[in-house]
Each structure stands twice: as structure tokens, then as C-alpha cells.
Amino acid sequence: PRFGREAVRTWLRNVLYSPPPKAGEDRRSVRTIAVVPVHHGASVEAVAQGLARALQTRGATARIDGHCVDAEGGRRLCQLSMDAADSIRYLDDLETEFRYVIYQTDTLSSEWAARCLRQADRVVAVASSGVPAQRTEMSELLRKHADGADVELVIVGDGVTDPLAWRELNGARLHHRVGVGRRSDFERLARLLTGRAVGVAFGGGGARGFAHIGLL
């Protein structure tokens, strides 16, 4: 009984503190997604890879980690200034060629991290379960460079975590949990980010609604 009460209490907190999700049309317009860490050691690589595989079934997907090089000049185009014409042209061409582009950064603060946020329609902020919520350089970057893109928190692992504290520190609207290697988790995340998720409505009033949850 105690576990059940705690589960319901957690569920209610998440519902009450979560703003309504964007309409499906808004989410279906998402083409560029930044995957960023909110603390050192966050599993950014695993999340970006899993999300890219899931999105690939919906359209051509590119994942860029900041090491893109000009084959002719040998320059790291992604590391140039955000105002550099060659860099802007390179990323614009990618976004034209691919249905989805994932911008990945492993650093909390850098020119490339800021560019990832500037390019993104949606930001996926990655935290590891079990890590206490903390303000980091990425928290500041999100405030400066997200340019109105919605931020959604992804917690990796099943350990105890306070998602609401992480969300408050980083301005995230929603949070999701995924496990490394769990393909179904990333397919669900891809559906939610792109507005292709299917919801379930419970009817019959409060008591009956909770009864439906019990059946699930």
C-alpha cells in the first residue's frame, strides 16, 4: 500500500507540474534536435545514438558531434565561429538534405555547445540517474542560447533521481526516462519529440480512472 501511495503521489506531481505538451503540428515541425549534458559524465553519446536510430525509421537522419571536417581544406567547420559563412552554409545544407539533424555536444560550455542550442528546434538535456540536481555551465547556456526551443529532460537509468529539481534548474518542460540499449525507450522518445505518440485517456471519474491505472 505504501509503495502504491508513493507511486500515485509521484505520478500526480509529474502531472501537476508539467505544462501541457505542444500541439501535434508544432512537434511534427521539429527537424533539428540538440542533445546536451547537464552535468559531467552524462550519457550523451548513448542518447544521441539511440535517438538517431529511432528517428532513422521516420526519415533520413544525420548526427553531428562537432568534429565535421572540410574534406578540401581540412578545417573543422563545426568549430568555427557561429557567424562564419562556411560553417553556416555547411549546416544549412545538412538541414536541407536530411529530415532530422541531431546536434550532439559532450561539453557543458563551448562554442560548439552554444551552436547546438542555437540550431535546435528541440533540446534534449541529458542527466544520469542517481546524480543530484545541480546548476552547471549548461544551465547558463540553455538560458542564453536556446532561442525559444523547448527543453526536455532525459534521465538515463533507473536510479533514484529528482526530475523536478533538474527540470527547474534547466528550464525543462517535461522529462523522460530511458535505459541504455533499450530500443523501445528511444522509439517512444522519438515519437514524443516529433508529435507521433499515441495517448490513452481514462474515463469514469477519479476512482475508476485509478482503477484503470491499476489494471495497466
Language model segments and positions:
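Structured core of small recognition/catalytic domains
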Residues: 46-102
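Flexible, glycine-rich phosphate/dinucleotide-binding loops
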Residues: 41-42, 70, 132, 160
